[in-house]
């Protein structure tokens, strides 16, 4: 997470290498301590990271056009981006990497980029996709070629650009939107490839992001964790100890059905190409990744968990509603203020009026009554479809 924050608006090539040499990633995907092949014992390099860095972090499974559409072969099927043999070759580049100065007295090594141990690095020539690495190249040189090759692959822009659009703006971006973002990925206007700041700017300022989102496929479902984070930020949630100990919020029946840093696998909480089956979205082949987290249990679990969090906090983490309590005697004003803060104008006047009518039924003649009005207004707004679907 620290690396992602550090490189979020930097260059993708640098981010890719930082993630690759991160001890945390090295442990997670078995690259740390990976050793060269041994013909006597039959040992071969671990292929886990070699597979995932291509499938998930850079080029994806199939070759893409600039607009994100798969390239098709003569048989009409998508063309694969890489083969098993190419995974095996890349895994040889990822040998010999380990902690930089592991020490029982100095824990700083767990944050330093991994370094290469020549004794464990695979010997001989190597190949990364179409790039040749000579037998004379050491671990650092081979890594540079691998990172350069992956970062410069034409798939990276449309593959990752589309996912950035999905996370920031809409689950089902048009091919033209993807192509425009991929174009900025390829060249930020100053000849620089992979400028993430420029790419994010292109995503957020694109005409499809700024225009009225009236199409049925527009927008995205807010992830449960993002809803919780917005509640905390909007209402000044604080942790007296500084530990922010909210526990595991994975349970779908009683909590969020999602928990920070606890995705069930390297494939994260949901697939970028997920299409909800048995739904109007599914009938129209509209991707909606976050809906993969949704079912009957999560719908009820989210509301029950949120109700408790709003009123009582989550353990030591509690919000403050001083400004909202000052508006509690005026239900329409309270709801309008909260709606603007939570949705940025995305909740209609009709929905606000309905919620305000319900809030007004709560007696505001006491401090407890005022607090209950605030709690109820926040809960109903954050439960409304117009809030849950961000447009």
Give residue ranges: language-model regions.
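Active-site substrate-binding loop specific to GH73 endo-beta-N-acetylglucosaminidase modules
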Residues: 1-247, 388-391
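Flexible, low-complexity segments enriched for small/polar residues
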Residues: 153, 157, 161-190, 201-391
